[in-house]
Regions:
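Non-catalytic, topology-defining segments of multipass membrane proteins
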Residues: 1-155, 198-232
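Alpha-helical transmembrane segments and their immediate juxtamembrane interface regions
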Residues: 148-183
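Short helix/loop segments within enzyme catalytic domains
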Residues: 177, 194-200
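Short, membrane-exposed interhelical loops at transmembrane-helix boundaries
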Residues: 185-191
């Protein structure tokens, strides 16, 4: 698994720092194409999905002639649906670990890389190779169950919820938070990273951590800091 790729390439999973970069990263894929598209500029999701959100809201208003109240309600349901999805993916998919070698590698590619290299700017937001299939799945689900007229504003809300997640995730890692809400979300997420991997699964909102009683514990941080460092 950790075979040398070539004399000019870093070994799979091993830290390296690109020229001019401030933070370490690692190579995730031996295939150059997959490696390239496992990285993404943090603005890319907004460039792709903001026009989609606006287009679907425009269609809901002009073509389907939905009332403002109906559009707003469906849009809000879509945002709420994203918060549930965000929590469930983070808790039960991203933090699922199979002890086999392939299971560990899949976990590393899905989420472990972010915990090992939390400040890698190119791997903080979801790559299109992941977000587009998710978008297709949820759009199909909404359209089949609700019909196109109701699915469009709900999907627009879910897409906006996803953008809030990606934007919040990038911001708490790379920007100083001055607002009360921003400081809370940053602390919430940093506790998940550094103290309590079994809590703090919501990134854009703590709602479902409160509901499922998985708020990250400051006591675990104190316990971690109190442990004597083991000799190498």
């Amino acid at each position: 698994m950790n075979e040398t790729l070539s004399s000019s390439k870093p070994r799979w999973g091993e830290p390296f720092r690109a020229p001019g970069a401030k933070f370490d990263t690692c190579r995730m894929f031996e295939n150059d194409f997959l490696e390239k598209y496992s990285r993404i500029h943090p603005a890319t999701p907004f460039v792709v999905y903001v026009p989609l959100v606006l287009f679907m809201l425009w269609r809901s208003w002009t073509r389907h002639e939905l009332a403002i109240a109906s559009m707003a309600g469906l849009f809000a349901c879509g945002v709420l649906a994203w918060t549930v999805t965000e929590y469930c993916l983070h808790r039960w998919v991203f933090h699922w670990v199979n002890e086999t070698s392939w299971g560990k590698r899949v976990h590393f590619m899905l989420h472990g890389v972010h915990h090992d290299f939390p400040n890698d700017k190119d791997r903080l937001v979801m790559p299109l190779l992941t977000s587009v299939p998710f978008a297709v799945i949820f759009w199909t689900l909404f359209r089949v169950t609700l019909g196109t007229t109701l699915a469009e504003p709900m999907f627009a809300g879910m897409a906006l919820g996803y953008l809030c997640y990606d934007g919040t995730h990038y911001a708490v890692h790379h920007f100083k938070q001055t607002s009360r809400i921003g400081r809370f979300l940053k602390r919430h997420h940093m506790l998940h990273h550094h103290a309590d991997h079994d809590g703090g699964f919501g990134v854009s909102s703590p709602l479902w951590d409160i509901v499922f009683r998985t708020m990250p514990s400051i006591k675990k941080l104190a316990a971690t800091q109190a442990k004597p460092r083991q000799a190498d």
